[in-house]
Design a protein with these regions (language model features):
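Basic nucleic-acid-binding alpha-helical/helix-turn surface characteristic of O6-alkylguanine DNA
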Residues: 1-132, 181-193
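Short glycine/serine-rich loop segments
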Residues: 133-177
């Protein structure tokens, strides 16, 4: 279960860049809760710029680069290890999802419950959030996921197990790489059953 707003709304937003096995990632947080995560862009500077950009409707938000401590430092260490193949479900990392629309939060809750090495289809996620037939809406919600990897949208596939669209930098190649790191089998090729 992901916590919503945890009293961090009035705290400043901090961010940092860190190197991983797949390149430089970035994380933004308020207090002890993660609010955004960024997979590697074309350069470390582009990754940091993306995580630091102001969100729509938050013109007063200033993101400052800081050295992480406490649970945020622990989260970075776990992400680093996960991307190096020491798998962690990352569910213990506290998130602030209070500003995310309710349907998206429901989709993210279901998605976050998928263990590394496993996948669901967009339709299965729709069924689990109580919206049968809403696979396209699930895909749209996952395309707007502000905290990829920690909310593992890469673990949601088309019904035929094919890798369709992935809005993170690197697109389908990044999705395929993350699934390979997690030793996920049966993706990328349609099955007969």
């Amino acid at each position: 279960m992901m916590p919503g707003r945890v009293g961090a709304i009035n705290l400043p937003t901090a961010a940092t860049l860190f190197d991983t096995a797949i390149g430089h990632c970035a994380i933004a947080w308020r207090g002890a809760t993660v609010i955004r995560f960024q997979l590697p862009e074309a350069s470390p500077a582009a990754t940091l710029a993306r995580i630091a950009r102001r969100r729509a409707g938050h013109l007063d938000e200033e993101v400052r680069e800081e050295k992480p401590t406490g649970v945020i430092a622990e989260a970075i260490a776990a992400i680093h290890a996960h991307l190096a193949g020491e798998l962690d479900d990352l569910r213990w990392i506290p998130l602030d999802t209070g500003e995310i629309p309710q349907f998206h939060r429901a989709v993210y809750d279901v998605t976050r419950a998928v263990d590394p090495g496993h996948t669901l289809s967009y339709g299965q996620v729709a069924d689990r959030v109580g919206a049968p037939g809403a696979a396209q809406a699930v895909g749209q919600a996952l395309g707007r996921n502000p905290i990829p990897l920690i909310i593992p949208c890469h673990r949601v596939l088309a019904a035929d197990h094919a890798l369709h669209g992935f809005s993170a930098p690197g697109g389908i190649d990044t999705k395929q790489r993350l699934l390979a790191i997690e030793r996920t089998s049966g993706f990328g090729e349609p099955t007969l059953f």
